[in-house]
């Protein structure tokens, strides 16, 4: 059988590997791998890896490097139950709360390999895991082990042995040390010679095959995981939503409600109920209501959600969609099943209060901000490697000043003679540029999405890994592009500086109600016509101001933003 490495770390083990998912897949295809593993010290890259493998007809084997009692072990999931256990353990690892009792509790459907350097853990784990193997990475190590459960396992951090030097710079950036000031023993952490492995350790390859054959993860997609609002008096979500909307209709229009509004409300509620989104609307209604009751300024509504009469009657939006001929189908269409998307603007300084409210109401593990990843951009790579090389800040600043951030370092070099001339001044500068080019694009750090929040009816660590971090909240361990596929709904809580500015202005104007500003105030219209719109949301860009001048506006401004966006899309 063909050997496939079982201990591969990618750049998702931040600042510890030179391997990205795309290159790993290409390497696997070039070497005719039918299966492939990922074993980072977190699960950040699992979904990228899983979907890339599936797309390229490669069987994905999902693993996790776990640290217990200062020793590393590697776990692989056999199926979805094992995957859920990996998720849970990954979350606990972010809490620094891994122990043997927890390992014993979450051992089902997992395969364990204990690397040679952690061999003292083997006796503590052999009665926990049904499938457990003793790992080695050389003939010398193998001679010191006994049993028929031996397996070759070499931690892979880069493809070619000549790439070791690049990894050393990555380690330098991680630790903050100058590159030649520390020992770094990772010279053997490259892809092994497969022919050598197959000849030297042939008798143990049956154990590799066992892992390849028994790890068969199929992710569960499109689960029903929307958050659930607890309705009073044991009402179901549809009945309660309808009750609030009918009350809203009477509040806005009194007893004489136009039949157009009645019919539209009936239609929207039927669609919302049929698509299973009643709870979603109640959850949004609840946190918007909380914000308004606590004097947190909320925007009037944006995007396609403004086309929903239900949103209007729930006071989620403040624009009457029938009055302005806005289409509900742009928001929710029974012919096109997609998740609803209501973006809510909160004043910049108080957004976190609304997030905290949701966490307290629904549960710490049912609400989580969404993780994002920062990568080495061209200038960032130059600065980080320059510091590792102890090159003067003046020289680094000058070189960064020559770099166009829209281009890669290679493109910058090929298109800029001044960069070429500067690098020729000093061999260290050439070396800096070469190292930085190798690191460019690798993941560097994690951050939090500016607006995105995930909410669920189940603890999120049953579905995705979580990271314990910011303000003791959890963040998702997966980025937002995959969450909807798993059945999780992203909600946007946008922090808008303009709302904070309006709040401050309102303090100077007691009794003023900006919701009742007339649409035909021609003094205000003239301000827009003259493009004197600095600081006005969506009207302050250079392009919009030029558009306003060309338009020679003399009527209410409704629709201008939409026309401008459409024009920009057509130009693009």
Question: What are the residue ranges of the model-derived segments?
Answer:
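Alpha-helical scaffold/interaction cores of sigma-54-like transcription cofactors
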Residues: 1-572
